[in-house]
């Protein structure tokens, strides 16, 4: 959050609201005077939650949607409706370790670097145009918990930089690639 706040602080923008499928950050968000909406997702019927998210985004006239800790795959309709306006932070150096539990996957593969990727959301999971990435070195002696801890710091910085680039209109998307000026 600190990195994201630094990114926002110097920009002519505001956080319209926080929509979360977790209720654990409500008090912190509301302490900052930001509207908070808890929209739980029923695994058997996700459509009502996605409809509510879309309604809230429209109600608050949000220009960009940031997915952080959301861990849900957006339906194709939302991906199309908000194309180029939904940014995700994924906790791996994409295209490696797509989807859930990338640190577990990285540990099983014995990688020497873990990372984070900030990208635009598309219908294909974790395959949208990449805005920003970074890595940190790990060793064979690091546990999955160590990797998660190291990765959190990288994720914050990558998201902050990626969001800043987007807000400054520095990202040119060409097909599935980006050029960041």
How would you label these PLM feature ranges?
Residues 21-22, 32, 49, 63-181:
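Donor/substrate-binding cores of folate-linked one-carbon enzymes
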Residues 12-24:
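Short internal beta-strands
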Residues 30-62:
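Adenosine-nucleotide cofactor-binding segment
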């Amino acid at each position: 959050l600190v990195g994201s706040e630094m990114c926002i602080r110097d920009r002519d923008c505001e956080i319209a609201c926080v929509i979360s499928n977790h209720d654990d950050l409500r008090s912190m968000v509301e302490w900052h005077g930001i509207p908070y909406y808890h929209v739980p997702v029923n695994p058997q019927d996700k459509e009502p939650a996605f409809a509510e998210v879309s309604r809230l985004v429209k109600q608050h006239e949000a220009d960009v949607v940031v997915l952080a800790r959301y861990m849900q795959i957006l339906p194709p309709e939302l991906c199309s409706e908000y194309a180029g306006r939904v940014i995700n932070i994924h906790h791996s150096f994409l295209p490696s370790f797509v989807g859930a539990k990338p640190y577990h996957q990285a540990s099983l593969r014995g990688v020497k670097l873990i990372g984070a990727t900030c990208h635009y959301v598309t219908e294909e999971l974790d395959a949208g145009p990449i805005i920003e990435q970074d890595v940190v070195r790990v060793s064979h002696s690091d546990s999955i918990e160590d990797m998660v801890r190291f990765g959190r710091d990288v994720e914050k910085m990558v998201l902050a930089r990626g969001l800043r680039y987007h807000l400054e209109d520095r990202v040119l998307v060409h097909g599935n690639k980006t050029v960041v000026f």
